[in-house]
Amino acid sequence: MMRLIIAAAGFALLTAAAHQDVALKALMPKGMVIGVAINQRQFEGADVAAVDMITTQFNQISPENVLKFQPTQPAADRYAFDAADRYVQFGLDHHMQVVGHNLVWHSQTGAWVFQGADGKPADRDTLLARMRDHIRTVVGRYKGKIHGWDVVNEAIDEDGSLRKSPWQVGIGDDYVAKAFEFAHEADLDAELYYNDFNLEKPAKRAGVIKLVQDLQARKLRIDGIGNQAHWRLDTPPIDDIDKALVELHATGLKVMFTELDINLLPNTPRGADPSVANPYANGLPDEVQQQLARRYADVFRVFLKHRDAVTRVTFWGLSDADSWLNRGRMNYPLLWDRERRPKPAFDAVVEALRNAR
């Protein structure tokens, strides 16, 4: 029996090693990069194992938080670039495509940005000046180093209208256009993107398409649309993902899946029964592991079917342990488990990529 246990353990180690010898980036079609959002411990090198995985598996990185408005400009008269500098340098040192996320968003932006000197809401001219200063300072600092920027994030509401964010209220509907204008002025060579979620929903997708067409009509640079791709096992249906991709690409822009993960937990109210809210606290059942693998295989087949349109796929986190979707529960949305071992979902993605070659 002991020999069987030792043999099984040895087989498991060999299998894991074989998996880790497979690099996703080596299997991607020409013109399509594969990336991951990384956190500060990772790009600063404190998590050595993570650094090895990131640089082995991926050829693109996005920052979880360090390039957002609040971390880079915590006060009107103060910028803070230490962490952002290290993130960018990590990508350059490892010859990876570096993406900047994000410049203008209604969240993670200091309240001071939207306040006037009298404590009332800032007027249009004040807000435009602050936006221009921020974008020119941040984008200008990394000119020639950051490949592309999520210029505006989540500006469209679920009904397809422009979200009534502090930016929209203070500046007007043209705040998005102004952000793209300022970003291009700061780095003429950087790619510029619009990024949002739920683009499989027709009304929201129509609003995004209308927005980017307005930017195009103004002759402003916009290179791509980022579909965040925070999905679930059964939703959105694969046909809806396919249809959304086709319609977004019909704008003439690149399509990118920028924050990919697959949420396995139910939406439950605060205080819900733990057995309902956190059903996989003791591990993920094999049946659900296989469902996750099939889901990842299906979505990657769509990406590969439209390889003429899709230029990037980025996972939002390296492993289940790193995912923002845990939130005090046990979620399993990515390709590697909490011990950073490849899951059946990893094998499914590898197979889909190999079959498409």
At which residue positions do the language-model features occur?
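Substrate-binding cleft and catalytic face of glycoside hydrolase catalytic domains
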Residues: 21-24, 56, 60-74, 83-200, ...
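Substrate-binding cleft/loops of secretory-pathway carbohydrate-active enzymes
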Residues: 198-221, 321-325
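Hydrophobic faces of well-ordered beta-strands that scaffold small-molecule active sites
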Residues: 34-38, 59-63, 98-102, 147, ...
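Short, acidic/polar
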Residues: 41-55, 129-138, 204-215, 296-302
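Boundary/entry segment of secreted carbohydrate-active catalytic domains
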Residues: 19-60, 64
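Acidic-and-aromatic substrate-binding clefts and catalytic sites of carbohydrate-active enzymes
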Residues: 37-48, 69-82, 156-161, 199-207, ...
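Bacterial Sec-dependent signal peptides at the C-terminal "C-region" and cleavage site
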Residues: 9-22
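Aromatic-rich peripheral "rim/lid" segments of glycoside hydrolase catalytic domains that contact
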Residues: 24-26, 111, 120, 137, ...
